[in-house]
C-alpha cells in the first residue's frame, strides 16, 4: 500500500472536542497507563464508563492492537451494560484489529485530540486512582503473574463495589448502578470470567 493512502484513511476518524456528558451507561473512555519500575515496563489498559464510573484495568507487556482486543473482550464480560461508544486516544494500538472488532460489534469509535487530557478526564482520574491506591502500594515487580492478577482483580472489585466516589454522591459504581438502573446484585459481582 502506498504511503499516502495510509494517511488518507486516517482522516475518516471521528474526533471529539469535549469530554462526554452521558447520563446513560455505555459510553466508554479508554486509555493506556505506562508504568516502568526497575527497567520493567507494563502497559495498563484502562476503561471507564462515563455515566456509572465503572472501571476496569488489565496489564500487558506490549502495547499492541491484539492486546487491546483482548482487553476489550475482558471488559465486555465484566461490564453490566451494552457498550454503545468507545472513546480513545490516537495511539497505534487503537487502530487495525481493534477498529475492525468494534465495527463487527456495531460500536462507534471516537478519538480524542493529542495532549488534551481534559477530554479523557474520567479515565485519567481512574488512572491516577489506580496508580496511587494500587500500583504505588503493590508495585509491578511481583514474581508470579497469578499473584499480581489476583491483587489487581481484588482491587478492581474493591473500587467498583466499595470505594465511594464524589462524582456519584459518595456511592461506589456498583451501588450507583443498583440504585439507578435496578439491576440484581448477582449479575454485578461475577469476576470469574476475567481469567484468561
Where are these regions (language model features)?
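Mobile-element integrase/transposase regions
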Residues: 1-46, 54, 70
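C-terminal domain-tail junction helix/linker
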Residues: 5-6, 10-19, 105, 132-196
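Short, conserved catalytic/metal-binding motifs centered on acidic residues
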Residues: 31, 53, 89, 120, ...
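Anionic group-transfer/hydrolysis microenvironments
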Residues: 33, 48-51, 91, 162
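Active-site beta-loop-alpha junctions of metal-dependent nucleic acid enzymes
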Residues: 40, 57-81
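Short small-residue beta-strand/loop micro-motif enriched in glycine and branched aliphatics
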Residues: 53-58, 110-112, 136
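Acidic/histidine-rich, metal-coordinating catalytic segments
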Residues: 63, 81-95, 169-172
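RNase H-like two-metal-ion nuclease catalytic core shared by retroviral integrases
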Residues: 88-103, 109-133, 143-149, 153, ...
Amino acid at each position: 500500500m502506498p504511503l499516502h493512502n495510509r494517511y488518507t484513511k486516517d482522516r475518516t476518524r471521528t474526533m471529539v472536542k469535549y469530554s462526554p456528558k452521558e447520563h446513560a451507561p455505555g459510553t466508554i473512555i479508554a486509555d493506556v497507563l505506562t508504568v516502568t519500575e526497575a527497567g520493567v515496563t507494563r502497559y495498563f489498559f484502562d476503561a471507564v464508563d462515563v455515566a456509572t464510573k465503572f472501571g476496569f484495568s488489565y496489564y500487558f507487556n506490549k502495547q499492541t492492537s491484539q492486546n487491546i482486543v483482548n482487553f476489550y473482550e475482558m471488559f465486555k464480560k465484566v461490564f453490566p451494560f451494552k457498550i454503545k461508544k468507545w472513546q480513545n486516544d490516537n495511539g497505534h494500538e487503537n487502530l487495525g484489529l481493534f477498529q475492525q472488532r468494534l465495527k463487527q460489534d456495531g460500536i462507534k469509535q471516537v478519538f480524542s485530540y493529542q495532549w488534551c487530557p481534559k477530554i479523557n478526564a474520567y479515565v485519567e482520574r481512574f488512572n491516577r486512582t489506580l496508580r496511587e491506591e494500587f500500583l504505588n502500594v503493590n508495585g509491578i515487580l511481583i514474581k508470579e503473574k497469578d499473584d499480581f492478577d489476583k491483587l489487581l482483580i481484588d482491587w478492581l472489585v474493591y473500587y467498583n463495589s466499595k470505594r465511594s466516589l464524589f462524582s456519584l454522591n459518595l456511592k461506589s459504581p456498583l451501588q450507583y448502578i443498583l440504585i439507578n438502573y435496578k439491576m440484581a446484585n448477582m449479575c454485578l459481582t461475577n469476576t470469574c470470567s476475567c481469567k484468561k
